[in-house]
Design a protein with these regions (language model features):
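Activation-segment/catalytic-loop signature of the eukaryotic protein kinase fold
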Residues: 71
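Conserved N-lobe ATP-binding subsite of Hanks-type protein kinase domains
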Residues: 19
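Protein kinase catalytic-loop region centered on the HRD/HxD motif
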Residues: 115-125
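Activation segment signature within eukaryotic-like protein kinase domains
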Residues: 109-110
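C-terminal lobe helix-coil module of Hanks-type protein kinase domains
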Residues: 117, 166-272
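Conserved short submotifs of the Hanks-type protein kinase catalytic core
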Residues: 77-91
Length: 292
């Protein structure tokens, strides 16, 4: 199968917004990843909107943003596509299936993601779907944010669509159908950060209605409740990201990154398990006497 000049080698992922294929660029002789979108995006006003927004996304340059190489609409099949750098790695959601992530690594990744979002926001690009499935961790430990603007690109309606993405990472204004801005992405990143260090989503529930209700009205337990070894100040960072009122969140992604980078470099000292009686102290004293 061929799309444009690119040879499709295999489909490596399928999601709500399309399919991703490992592909070969014969002109340059390199592997690339191609995202294939529904054909509906190639007709009418949707076609022009797809091309315009893809051009904006293609201007984003940051070490933690997947690089967009090319875009087009295949003449033979009328399939819209984006051509991106191909990287070996795993999506963050698959890594989180194994449990929480060490704090220093999680906070460093989150700081890089915040820095990447800052670059996009300055260009007027809102991600709109920040979640672990859209974060790639490469085999050499780098973090890459994927699918910038893809939630809007994949919408068949030219108007803003309030409910796209994954409910557990929606912000309150998204649920209420209000306008979203850069601070909406920071709410979603706060959910991801909470999940990375605790292994738990802060607004999880058994139903869509339950999740939305929690996002709108509940205050989650601080991350330190599940992970007491977290450094002082981290709970406040997450709490600020998850504020219901956007004006109470970080004003910019750069401000969030500036708070996260120092925390990522801070050593985490695991707390000793609490002693329920005096036996632990007596046992330690006995060992010291025996070794004397």
């Amino acid at each position: 199968m061929q799309v444009g000049r690119y040879e499709i080698l295999e489909i490596i992922g399928t999601g709500a917004h399309g399919r991703v294929a490992r592909s070969h660029d014969p002109l340059i002789g390199r592997l690339v990843a191609i995202k294939l979108f529904p054909k509906e995006l190639a007709s009418g006003a949707a076609r022009q909107r797809f091309l315009q927004e893809a051009r904006v996304v293609g201007q984003l340059s940051h070490p933690s943003i997947i690089t967009l190489h090319d875009m087009g609409i295949d003449e033979a099949t009328q399939t819209p596509y984006l051509v991106m750098e191909f990287l070996e790695g795993q999506p963050l959601d698959r890594i989180l299936e194994k449990g929480s992530i060490p704090f220093s690594r999680a906070s460093a990744w989150a700081a890089e993601l915040a820095s990447a979002l800052g670059v996009a926001h300055r260009k007027g690009v809102i991600h709109g779907d920040v979640k672990p499935a859209n974060v790639l961790i490469t085999d050499d430990g780098r973090v890459k944010l994927m699918d910038f603007g893809m939630a809007r690109l994949a919408s068949r309606d030219s108007a803003a669509t309030p409910l796209v993405g994954t409910p557990a990472y929606w912000c309150p204004e998204q649920i209420m159908g209000k306008p979203q801005d850069a601070r909406s992405d920071l709410f979603s990143l706060g959910v991801v950060l909470h999940e990375m260090v605790t292994g738990q989503r802060p607004f999880d529930a058994d139903s869509l209605q339950g999740i939305c209700g929690r996002v709108l009205s509940s205050t989650p337990l601080p991350p330190s409740h599940a992970n007491p070894s977290l450094p002082t100040g981290f709970d406040e960072v997450v709490s600020r990201c998850l504020a219901k009122d956007p004006s109470a969140r970080y004003a910019t992604a750069e401000a969030l990154a500036q708070d996260l980078y120092p925390l990522a470099r801070r050593k985490v000292i695991p707390q000793a398990p609490p002693q329920t009686n005096g036996n632990g102290l007596r046992d330690r004293a006995a060992r010291l006497l025996r070794s004397a």
